[in-house]
């Protein structure tokens, strides 16, 4: 069973279907020909998340029979992804959905019609220019990671031969401008707040620099800033797509599926002919298009206003997901866990995040209307966290914690104060912040040293708790005031807000001795 056999009209469909593989229900070659002649969608970034989510959404739309064109992928970072994960398999791939029950679902993704290298030095560049000059093009989307939106002075100075992703895209947009000021929408689908604005800022920076250097006209800059021609809508995307999983590979081998080789490129991209991803997914998109909108709602995309996209992001980051993740990360490191899916089976941990989410944070949640916050938390706790295929660790989530506490917990505390709500309702959030001081000590609940995860303020903050020792009675906890007064870390001065004594009491309990983290956590969640 190989992917390329699916392009043979005489392949044995029953063999695949009997083993649980969902096959395309559309004419692959007809879609490819139509897309080549009249492309509507090009996507930059050919990584795992693209195949698992945007390409799969379009695959669903094609399967519905209500759409007839595919997506062209262009890789901006790693040419080997095209050479090793697309070309040998005729741009077909296998999506394996990882369910929290431990089972999998298998679907052939055939919506990708071309795979190109976005490199001005290579022959694919001419095809990319042709695509951008075609009036039918509606959407250029991106999953290039948050780092992909970076640029620097050196690349700006390279003129119309840039090396960074946004410079390349701006050069292609210049071709579209010269073809008749044709409209197009640029859609970031990367997991970062206000992603469309990041994309817009980068494109504008290149165009304005080129205009200043006399390489393009100011009319090109005006074209990019004309929202009747070019838009940069925001989106909120959420779907975990880990590296190819060994258990998945074994399950596919047992089926007789032969395209299961791991691929690691010279640039350390990890991929395979199959892509495995969690079953849960969200894509909320600002409905702001200039040349028509692709019917991705057929695949489950929710179109809405920019304000609502922002509310969904705020709901996730301040209440329904990120704070719970950080609470698990801090206590997970202290309690010796190295896998999130194992940690969520701990009754005290589960109770901690349930009560933080439903009882303490929910009274001030930003409700976007388009998603239900209670249901979102329920799916997160009951389906996403226990998923045995997810390799996420407390140690990874604990990275850069000092940069996250203000938004993940400080915002909730500030809303309580601003709205005059009863601050005594906040019990477990202060406990998590107190546990952060214990975490900074770098000694787990068994008394064994551990290395806190990388953080730009780690050395500075560890020095602030250095006077404290585990198991020492009658020690002076006054050093905590300097830490918990840091507005840059917590979003507010917790002592000034009246939480100082409460946090000190929790820290004292957590530092009491071996096993005190477990004892304190259990006591707090049971009392709550």
Where are these regions (language model features)?
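Substrate/ligand-engaging "lid" and interaction regions
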Residues: 1-528
């Amino acid at each position: 069973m190989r992917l390329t056999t699916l392009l043979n009209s005489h392949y044995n469909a029953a063999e695949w279907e009997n083993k649980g593989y969902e096959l395309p229900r559309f004419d692959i070659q007809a879609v490819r020909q139509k897309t080549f002649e009249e492309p509507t969608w090009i996507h930059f970034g050919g990584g795992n998340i693209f195949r698992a989510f945007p390409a799969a959404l379009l695959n669903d739309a094609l399967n519905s029979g209500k759409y007839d064109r595919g997506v062209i992928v262009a890789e901006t970072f790693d040419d080997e992804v095209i050479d090793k994960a697309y070309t040998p398999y005729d741009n077909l791939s296998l999506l394996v959905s990882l369910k929290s029950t431990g089972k999998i679902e298998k679907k052939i993704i055939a919506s990708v019609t071309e795979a190109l290298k976005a490199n001005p030095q290579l022959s694919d560049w001419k095809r990319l220019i042709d695509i951008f000059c075609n009036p039918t093009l509606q959407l250029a989307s991106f999953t290039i990671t948050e780092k992909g939106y970076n640029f620097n002075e050196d690349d700006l100075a390279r003129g119309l031969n840039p090396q960074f992703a946004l410079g390349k895209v701006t050069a292609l947009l210049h071709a579209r401008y010269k073809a008749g000021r044709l409209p197009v929408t640029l859609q970031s689908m990367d997991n970062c707040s206000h992603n469309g604005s990041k994309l817009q800022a980068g494109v504008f920076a290149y165009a304005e620099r080129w205009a200043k250097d006399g390489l393009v006209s100011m009319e090109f800059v005006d074209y990019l800033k004309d929202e009747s021609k070019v838009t940069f809508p925001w989106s909120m995307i959420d779907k975990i797509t880990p590296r190819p999983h060994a258990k998945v590979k074994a399950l596919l081998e047992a089926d007789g599926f032969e395209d299961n080789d791991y691929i690691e490129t010279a640039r350390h991209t990890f991929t395979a002919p199959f892509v495995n991803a969690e079953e849960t997914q969200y894509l909320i998109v600002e409905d702001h298009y200039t040349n028509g909108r692709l019917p991705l709602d057929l695949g489950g995309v929710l179109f809405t206003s920019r304000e609502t996209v922002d509310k969904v992001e705020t709901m996730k980051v301040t209440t329904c997901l990120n704070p719970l993740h950080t609470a698990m990360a801090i206590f997970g490191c202290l309690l010796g866990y190295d896998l999130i899916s194992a940690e969520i089976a701990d009754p005290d941990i589960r109770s901690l995040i349930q009560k933080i989410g439903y009882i303490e944070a929910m009274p001030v949640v930003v409700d976007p209307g388009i998603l239900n916050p209670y249901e979102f938390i329920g799916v997160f706790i009951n389906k996403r966290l226990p998923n045995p295929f997810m390799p996420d660790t407390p140690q990874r989530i604990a990275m850069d914690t000092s940069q996250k506490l203000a938004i993940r917990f400080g915002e909730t505390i500030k809303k309580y104060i601003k709205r005059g709500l009863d601050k005594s309702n906040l019990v477990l959030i202060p406990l998590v912040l107190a546990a952060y001081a214990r975490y900074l000590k770098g000694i787990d609940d068994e008394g064994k040293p551990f290395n806190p995860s990388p953080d730009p303020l780690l050395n500075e903050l560890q020095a602030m708790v250095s006077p404290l020792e585990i198991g020492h009675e009658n020690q002076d906890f006054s050093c905590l005031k300097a830490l918990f007064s840091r507005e840059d870390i917590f979003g507010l001065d917790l002592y000034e807000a009246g939480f100082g004594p409460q946090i000190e009491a929790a820290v004292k309990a957590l530092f009491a001795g071996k096993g005190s983290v477990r004892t304190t956590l259990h006591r707090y969640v049971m009392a709550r």
